[in-house]
Amino acid sequence: MASSTQTNVTIAPKTLQQLRQQDAVILVDVREPLEFVGEHITDAYSLPLSRLNPSQLPQAEGKTTVLYCQSSNRSGNALQQLRSAGVEGIIHLEGGLLAWKQAGLPTVKTKNAPISIMRQVQIIAGSLVLTGVLLGSFVAPGFYFLSGFVGAGLLFAGLSGTCMMANLLGKLPYNQIKD
C-alpha cells in the first residue's frame, strides 16, 4: 500500500507488483551499475544515485515512477533530491530490493556478475585485520596498528555512511560497468 507524508512516499512490494502487472509504473534502480548488473527487478532502468540527473529520469504519462535501491535508504535520498528539483509523480519501494525478495517476488540475476563492492570491502578489511593480528603476534607489536586502522575506518564508515574503501574499489577497472 502506498503511504504518504510531506517528505516521503513509499509503496509496499506486493502493491508494486500489482501495479507492475497493470503496466502502471516505471521502475528505476538507483544503486550503482555493479549492483544493478548483479541483480535487479525485471524491466527496471538503472540511474545511479551518484549520477542522478532529473532530466534523465524515465517518466511516462499516466505512470508512476518508482525508485528503489538495496534497502530504501538511497532511493529515499534520491526521492528527496528529485522532489527538491521539482519532479512530481515519484515514489520509492519500501524496504528496497531486500523487501522485494523477502516478499518472494522475482528478480533478474546475472550469472558471473562481479563480486559486489561491499563483499570486496569485507574481504579486504578482514584480510588486513587478520594480517595485522598475525604480524603483530609473530613479527612486531607495531603491526597491530594495521588492525586498529582498519577498525577505525570501518567505524567511520558505519557512523558516516561513507566507506572510503568502497569508493576506491569502485574506481578500479574491473568494477567499472558500461551503462
From Swiss-Prot:
Gene3D superfamilies: 6.10.140.1340, Rhodanese-like domain
GO terms under cellular component: plasma membrane
Membrane topology: Multi-pass membrane protein
UniProtKB keywords: Cell membrane, Membrane, Transmembrane, Transmembrane helix
Subcellular location: Cell membrane
InterPro entries linked: Rhodanese-like_dom, Rhodanese-like_dom_sf, Thiosulfate_ST/Rhodanese-like, YgaP-like_TM
Pfam families: Rhodanese, YgaP-like_TM
Predominant location category: membrane
Transmembrane parts of this sequence: 115-135, 138-158
The Rhodanese domain, residue ranges: 21-109
Xref: PROSITE patterns: RHODANESE_3
Taxonomic superkingdom: Bacteria
Protein name: Uncharacterized protein slr1261
UniProt source species: Synechocystis sp. (strain ATCC 27184 / PCC 6803 / Kazusa)
